Amino acid sequence: IPLRLVGSEMCIRDSICMTMLAMPWIATGTFVYQSFISTSKGWGPYVIAQSFMAYSIFSVITLFISGFLIDKFSSRRLLIYMNIPLLMATVVLFYFDSSFSSFIFLGLIGISNGLANVLGSSTWAEIYGVKYIGSIKALTTALMVFSTAFGTALFGILIDNGLSIEPVSYTHLTLPTKA
């Protein structure tokens, strides 16, 4: 869909948008409904809180590694790998109930978060140049904020309709692949 924005021509491709927006909607939904996830999985009250250490550690490590990888291979080449850890995290949430799976789940989300933070800036600069990077970042940040609201609302609607975490995670597993 071509879009004119502050004198620049910017093409938002569905696959790029869905790739970039999957991380914020799934991660935010997970963070907001962590007590529901913990209860659904039968985890103790501190399991997810402790698992955020894995999220933080893997996110920071991935931030450093992804910068090096982008310089070596380019953002476009790495973009296709950004949501693989997120996909794996959703599979872990769907299939596994042990407390240890919470650490794996949030660690994998941390990896996707680290990739998304770096790729979220460098991808647009690679594709469209830096002349209108402020306008492009403003638009993509607005879309990201919408994505976080969408994810939280979708989680809430599915939970309010009586679904357990497994069907909710399955929904979040399949939606980003529909583009």
For each predicted feature, which ranges?
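Single conserved hydrophobic/aromatic residue that forms the stacking wall/gate
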Residues: 1-7, 12, 172-179
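Extracytoplasmic gate region of multi-pass secondary transporters
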Residues: 13-53
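Intracellular juxtamembrane helix-capping segments at the cytosolic ends
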Residues: 115-128
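A late C-terminal transmembrane helix in Major Facilitator Superfamily
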Residues: 133-160
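Helix-to-loop junctions at the C-terminal end of transmembrane segments
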Residues: 63-74
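Interfacial helix-cap and linker-helix signal at transmembrane-aqueous boundaries
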Residues: 38, 69-70, 156-163
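Residue-level signature of mid-helix packing/kink "hotspots" within the transmembrane helices
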Residues: 56-60, 64, 149
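Structural signature of the two symmetry-related core transmembrane helices
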Residues: 78-91
